[in-house]
Amino acid sequence: RISIARAFLKDAPIIILDEPTSALDVCVKAQVINLLQDLQDEMGLSILFISHKLNVLRSLADKITVMYRGRVVEEAPTEQIFANPIHPYTKSLLEAIPKLDPSLRKRRTFIDDSFIQSNIPKYSLNDVNFVSTNDSQIGFVEIDNNHFVEAEVV
């Protein structure tokens, strides 16, 4: 918490936080998130919050960008990510969030590169706005208003 407060003393327009709530108990984690929300509202501060726990980001972020192996694979407003995840890695991150209701729990499976590659979404150029390409077949496409995903363009 002291490191976070120290960053705000410099009056920076943006603060970058890398897993600031990891290894914190639930009460302290909630206090840190509440502090960040208050300071964000009061100072109009932009926060780049790096985390693999999407449930932590849900209450804090306006937009979520999901990266896998150094590549952006999905980006959308927070509620779109939670309501309609498209990329298999985004889906796996959301499935990793613990569920209180036993009927909603799924048996977790390990995903690897071959699973990701074989489950990349496929879209026709006629159905989406093509944004950019990494190679000849994989591109970054807009599938909905401000919802972008890495996909195979066919």
Residue ranges and their predicted role:
Residues 44-50:
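Conserved H-loop
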Residues 15-19:
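Catalytic Walker B motif of ABC-type/P-loop ATPase nucleotide-binding domains
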Residues 9-13:
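A short, proline-enriched helix->beta-strand linker immediately N-terminal to the Walker B motif
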Residues 30-43, 55:
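Helical segment within the ABC ATPase nucleotide-binding domain
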Residues 78-154:
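Short catalytic/signature loops enriched in Gly
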Residues 72-76:
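ABC ATPase "signature
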Residues 57-59:
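A short, surface-exposed alpha-helical micro-motif characterized by mixed small hydrophobic
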